[in-house]
Amino acid sequence: MAIKQPKGKTVRRLGVNIYGNPKYDKLLDRKPNGPGKERGARKRGKTSVYGEQLKEKQKFRFAYGISERQFRNLYKKASRMPGVTGDNMISLMEQRLDNTIYRMGFAISRAQARQMVTHAYFFINGKPVNIPSMCVSVNDVITTKNKKGIQNLIRHNMSTSQSARGSWLTIDDEKLSATVNILPVTTDIQPVGNIQNVVEYYSRNA
């Protein structure tokens, strides 16, 4: 489910460019204060621990385009997995098909990747897929629909995309395909926020 919020206001409210588009860096330089916080206005008191946890949760939710229900379920799944819950959460978010397409450099944003998946631009192991939230697995092969318009769009995106490509993927720029070699790990990813705060938020609001 896509999250429909004004991206500029979201970036200003969270104080970080969660979408990766350089125009939001410029926006934060011009307007570093959150929406409604005018220059010279009396500052509010220090944000509570709960407030900080909520803010970090929203950073991840909006960056990956995940609904509250999906994100809570993702936390529950991660908490049942072996290992560190926060690391598991990041890995699960990165395994989402829409994010994988974004990490392949085939889309300039996760929102665009989500739309492309919904329109069934891709195949996994030869089968058409249209569910952005599905998770890829090791040895999955992702290929592109053989339509000139789709492939031209992807090649254009590849030339303009500024996202960091996933080191866990082997990407074939000529064939417009990728293979999942390993599952993504946090050491290969620059998180958009403090995932431990997110874990603490859900552990106290389960």
Swiss-Prot record:
The record's keywords, sorted A to Z, are: Ribonucleoprotein, Ribosomal protein, RNA-binding, rRNA-binding
Is RNA-binding found in the keyword set? yes
As one GO molecular function, the record gives:
rRNA binding
Highest rank taxon of the organism: Bacteria
Gene Ontology cellular component list: small ribosomal subunit
Indicate yes or no for the key word Ribonucleoprotein. yes
Identify the residues that the record assigns to the S4 RNA-binding domain, covering every copy: 95-157
* UniProt cross-references to Gene3D superfamilies, sorted A to Z: Ribosomal Protein S4 Delta 41, Chain A, domain 1, RNA-binding S4 domain
> Region (Disordered): which ranges?
25-49
**In UniProt terms, what function does this protein have?**
One of the primary rRNA binding proteins, it binds directly to 16S rRNA where it nucleates assembly of the body of the 30S subunit.
* Protein family per UniProt: Belongs to the universal ribosomal protein uS4 family.
Q: How does it assemble?
A: Part of the 30S ribosomal subunit. Contacts protein S5. The interaction surface between S4 and S5 is involved in control of translational fidelity.
- Protein name (record): Small ribosomal subunit protein uS4
- Give the originating organism: Treponema denticola (strain ATCC 35405 / DSM 14222 / CIP 103919 / JCM 8153 / KCTC 15104)
